[in-house]
């Protein structure tokens, strides 16, 4: 099943913004839910398991989500992970670098095939959209309702308001750390 996320890099992520992204992605990793309801919830009964790069060895510590320069793949630092190959939950590796290299853009998309690690791919894309606005142009085959479970979980984890990328949401809806406020998002106004 094809289910793509696109993230064309437009600029290098400034050091301070990359550090904030890393910190929040590690926090999200340490608070992962047991299963994924993103991407239409096709794997809602399967655990979210992240593995290094190609999906062979499990990530146990959040620091292991990040690697430095991998030759022809990217320069600088990147988050690089996949689903678990041992149980058939891997698809295309997700690589998100901090350094813009116009000559090497082959990883500007990730086909998660709706597998459980899609949850964390969406998490990373929401966080980089928030922490480094303008550095990536983000879109997806998924619709707003496919990303909503992730952002509703993520806003309380990081403790501040978040928005989805414009190409996914279209309306700029805000999601808040308070779960009560999140329930109010999208409700009709009764003011006449």
Name every feature range the model reports, one short phrase each.
Residues 1-191:
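Acidic (Asp/Glu-rich) sequence patches and key acidic residues
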């Amino acid at each position: 099943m094809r289910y793509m996320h696109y993230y064309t890099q437009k600029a290098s992520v400034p050091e301070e913004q990359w550090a904030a992204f890393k910190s929040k992605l590690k926090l999200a990793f340490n608070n992962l839910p047991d299963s994924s309801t993103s991407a239409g919830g096709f794997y809602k009964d399967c655990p979210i398991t992240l593995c290094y790069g190609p999906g062979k060895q499990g990530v146990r510590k959040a620091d292991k989500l990040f690697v430095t320069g991998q030759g022809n793949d990217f320069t600088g630092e990147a988050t690089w992970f996949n689903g678990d190959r041992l149980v058939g939950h891997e698809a295309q590796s997700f690589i998100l670098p901090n350094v813009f290299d116009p000559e090497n853009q082959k990883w500007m998309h990730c086909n998660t095939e709706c597998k459980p690690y899609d949850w964390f791919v969406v998490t990373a894309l929401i966080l980089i959209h928030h922490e480094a606005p303008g550095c990536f142009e983000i879109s997806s085959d998924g619709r707003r309702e496919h990303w909503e479970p992730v952002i509703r979980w993520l806003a309380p984890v990081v403790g501040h308001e978040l928005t989805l990328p414009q190409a996914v949401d279209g309306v700029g809806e805000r999601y808040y750390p308070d779960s009560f406020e999140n329930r109010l998002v999208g409700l009709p106004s009764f003011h006449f």
